[in-house]
Amino acid sequence: MNSDPRLHIIAVTGIVEKNGKYLILKRSEREVAYPGFWTVPGGKLVRHEYENLALTEKTDAWYDIVSRTLEKEIMEEAGLEIEGIRYLTDMVFIRPDNIPALVLSYYCRHKAGNVALGKDMVDYAWIMPEEGKNYQIIPGILDEIIMVDKILKN
């Protein structure tokens, strides 16, 4: 068990919509959590990736790190540019290595690019929500895709 209960992994995920379909990616078998499952793009907030960025003027803080991380992760994992990032929900789970992970879930629209898989993903699909049952998707993610679909259709 983690010796410091204050420590969590913080991750951000993005449900990418394009023409009424949603991007899912298949994780490699090397992943610690949910190897070989389908997911949406995203990744961890990593200190060394933002601490060299310019600080916000007159503060000692970095702003928009979550959205900037999401843009970076979607580019790295899927080769896509996105726009219109909006908050959806959040959740916490305990990984198989006993480290708690806080996941911030967002949705966005495809802006440009064709899918080009990064090193941690082995396949992709653009799906309608009702097609999700045909894939072994990480629990909860299909529910989030359905939530986004309802939001965007209203």
Which functions belong to the PLM regions below?
Residues 1-13, 30:
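Acidic, metal-coordinating catalytic segment for phosphate/diphosphate chemistry
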Residues 8, 66, 100-102:
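Residue-level preference for beta-strand/loop junctions
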Residues 18:
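A cytosolic small-molecule/anion-sensing beta-strand core signal
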Residues 77-84:
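Short secondary-structure junctions
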Residues 105-107, 116-148:
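NUDIX/MutT-family hydrolases
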